[in-house]
Amino acid sequence: RTSSRHQDFKDAVAVQFALGDVLLHTHGHNEPFFGMGNRGKVVNIWQWRADWQTEIETKEKIEYATKGMDLDAMIFGGEVNPVDALNPFRDNPVEELNAEGFGTLTPQPRTKQNVLGKGVWKDGHWSVVLYRTLDSLNKWDKQFMNDQPILVAFAIWDGYEQDRNGRKVVSMWQRLHLP
């Protein structure tokens, strides 16, 4: 669950799709690395964050576990952070990103953010739904086509276990078949 205390870590979930024409476990393993892709093998990531949803629903700014000591706060100055005020994603708890390996995670521009979602906390567990139209004109989005398997992987951040950034539970690639 998400709280507004800075010492609490936040819950999140991400779904990752391999871009391009790749198949799981083909000769030569042409699929990207399941941990955020690798050079030349870009992945499309949809991340839902419980803290963003709480901010949207309560209109209350959440403190972070870094207690304002992250790079933005050091560069732009603590509580009054002009970069934070311009954050375009706070009307949606989901952010769409791309990566091609560690250290390359990049949010898509605001005009390309087309994934929506919502999480519901009930009986000590989150249920999260992420969605967008099947087709997309953005070349950095996964193109969903009927009768073609899709490579999908998942990541879960459990704030109670102090998960954050690269500390998370991840799955290997799975095949998803759309009817």
Please state what every model-predicted region is:
Residues 101-103, 125-127, 131, 147:
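Glycine-centered flexibility motif
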Residues 85-110:
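Surface-exposed, low-complexity/disordered Ser/Thr/Gly/Pro/Asn-rich loops and linkers
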Residues 16, 111-112, 123-127:
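Generic hydrophobic/packing signal
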Residues 120, 127-136:
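A beta-strand/beta-hairpin structural motif
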Residues 62, 67, 105-106, 110-114, ...:
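Mature, soluble, non-transmembrane domains
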Residues 115-121:
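Beta-strand-rich interaction surfaces with strong enrichment in secreted/lumenal proteins
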Residues 2-90, 122, 137-179:
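Acidic/polar low-complexity flexible segments
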